[in-house]
A protein has these predicted regions:
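Polybasic, lysine-rich low-complexity intrinsically disordered segments
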Residues: 2, 22, 42-48
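Compositionally biased, low-complexity segments
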Residues: 3-5, 51, 55
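Intrinsically disordered, low-complexity segments enriched in serine/proline and basic residues
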Residues: 7-9, 21, 32
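Low-complexity, intrinsically disordered segments with a bias for serine/threonine
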Residues: 11-13, 41, 59, 63
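Structural/interface elements that position substrates and couple domains in central-metabolism enzymes
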Residues: 56-506
Length: 506
């Protein structure tokens, strides 16, 4: 009769077959226990993230580190690889940009993401995370290869899969039967059936007798909170058409305390597009409601609170403002529309979501014009360049689009962003705008202040000081982050989205 060992799990104590362990595993376990207490000290204010570490220590089976390759070091690849290393895996991040790889090796971060830099430096120092341009070597060493390369949109909204195809071909060239079984994982956001095409490329170009499965494992990280999202996910979606691949992928995610959604390859590919499109729909819906509120004299924030308390709806993403932007939502909505069109099932609903989003910035500009009449030579300060707070990413940023439009109409524009000054300068090259290094200097002599990104420091700004620096006391809050009564008390006219305008006593 086999001896039994017990272990803790979210379902309580359960018994597992006892098997002899390598004594070195005990050392690994003790090291992880020590690392956990260090993590708790670092993250005293983040109980959820600490609980991830706890579940990692008392997981149902003793953790075995795996060798993982991440192809691509953008937001998704770099953050995913770093978090895998943080929980104990051995990770090689691969990129064909030699300069970028050298910078990463030397501790230079190509992106801003809270907590990421410290995590990268500590795992590189510990030997758990490395960077290389040698894809073949990574494929030789690693059991599982994640593809996290860009999937930019074409003009018609379809997804450009040329990077996926090229990387798949390179992986196929590097695979050898003697390396053993390998799993290739699509981590990039891809259209349904991409996994099948990757499999075809592998079969076409790989050596005979190579054993490979292709898996879809979409990411759901949010820029600005990507580390927390990856360390404490709502769910982990794994799409595989083989049980062997599914079992190994579950081992990869063993340290994470989250439900695993086990589905087929095509369903996993569709989940990401469907999820992001639904979130974009919620944003456009509340912005459409905001337009009604402005005409009816209602407050969209109160309306959102009232409907968001319904558990079937939730308050998340019911934030009226300038609309959605960034590298995901615009691309994924267009991609899903294109996928549906190609399959002969047009998504008219999502086309309206796009139109509402495009109209939102026009509605906002109309209100500024209504107040200021002609914008030429008007001094307008813009707080925010990044597409959202806690990131330096300006891809598809509504703030960037707004700055461009104001400059095109002849306004004298100054702009400030705490993290996106450099990326913003590149995105706004050729645009007549002055990017400032201080949020208060940005508003000096301005006739209008526009809040375009929801940075916390804007919400807590000293409005009395801002009023003293500005030429005229007019605020257009495109993110509804300022307290209107405080703005009025400081002497401002306050205009927001989906709420009535407020004026100081005259």
């Amino acid at each position: 009769m086999k001896r039994q060992a017990f272990s803790a799990s979210r379902r309580g104590v359960r018994f597992n077959p006892w098997e002899p362990r390598n004594p070195l595993d005990e050392l690994t376990y003790v090291a992880r226990l020590g690392a956990f207490f260090v993590m708790v000290q670092k993250l005293q204010t983040d109980k959820k993230l600490a609980l991830v570490g706890l579940s990692y220590i008392i997981s149902p089976e003793f953790f075995q580190a795996m060798n993982l390759a991440i192809i691509g070091t953008g937001y998704v690849g770099l953050t995913t690889g770093t978090c895998f290393a943080e929980v104990g895996h051995n990770v090689i991040c691969v990129d064909n940009d030699r300069e970028k790889v050298e910078k990463l090796k030397n501790g230079y971060m190509p992106i801003y993401e809270p907590e990421l830099e410290d995590m990268i430096l500590s795992n590189v120092s510990a030997g758990k995370l490395s960077f290389t341009t040698d894809l073949a070597a990574a494929v030789h060493e690693c059991e599982i290869i994640f593809i996290a390369v860009p999937t930019p949109p074409h003009a018609d909204g379809s997804v450009d899969l040329s990077y996926i195809e090229a990387v798949s071909h390179e992986i196929a060239d590097a695979l050898r039967p003697e390396h053993g079984y390998r799993i290739i994982v699509d981590k990039s956001t891809v259209p349904v059936s991409t996994g099948s095409k990757v499999s075809e490329v592998i079969r076409r170009y790989a050596a005979c007798d190579v054993k490979v499965d292709v898996v879809s494992n979409p990411e759901f990280l949010r820029e600005g909170s990507a580390v927390k999202d990856l360390m404490n996910p709502d769910r982990i979606v794994i799409g595989a058409n083989s049980q062997r691949a599914m079992d190994l992928m579950k081992r990869v995610y063993q340290p994470f305390s989250a439900p695993i959604v086990e589905v087929d390859l095509s369903s996993a590919e569709l989940i990401k597009h469907a999820a992001n499109s639904f979130l974009a729909l919620k944003i456009s819906y509340i912005n459409a409601v905001a337009a009604v509120c402005e005409k009816a004299g209602a407050d969209v924030e109160l309306v959102a609170q009232g409907i968001g308390m319904d558990k079937r709806i939730s308050r998340h993403f019911l934030n009226a403002g300038l609309g959605y932007g960034g590298s995901c939502f615009p691309k994924d909505v267009k991609g899903f529309i294109n996928i549906a069109d190609q399959l002969g099932t047009p998504m008219y609903l999502l086309k309206e979501v796009e139109q509402i989003n495009a109209r939102q910035i026009e509605r906002f500009l109309d209100r500024i014009r209504e107040k200021m009449w002609v914008l030429r030579n008007k001094r307008i300060a813009v707080w925010g360049i990044a597409f959202k707070q806690n990131t330096d990413d300006v891809r598809e940023s509504v703030a960037v689009k707004l700055i461009r439009r104001l400059a095109e109409e002849g306004a004298i524009v100054t702009a400030y962003d705490p993290k996106a000054a450099e990326t913003g300068a590149r995105a706004l090259e050729g645009v007549s705008v002055t990017i400032c290094s201080d949020m208060y200097e940005c508003v000096r002599d301005a006739e209008v202040l526009v809040v375009a990104t929801e940075w916390r420091q804007f919400a807590t700004a000293n409005l009395v000081k801002v009023r003293e620096l500005m030429h005229l006391p007019i605020i257009f809050d495109g993110r509804n982050i300022l307290h209107g009564e405080n703005a009025v008390h400081a002497g401002f006219e306050y205009h927001s989205v989906g709420r009535r305008s407020l004026y100081p006593d005259r």
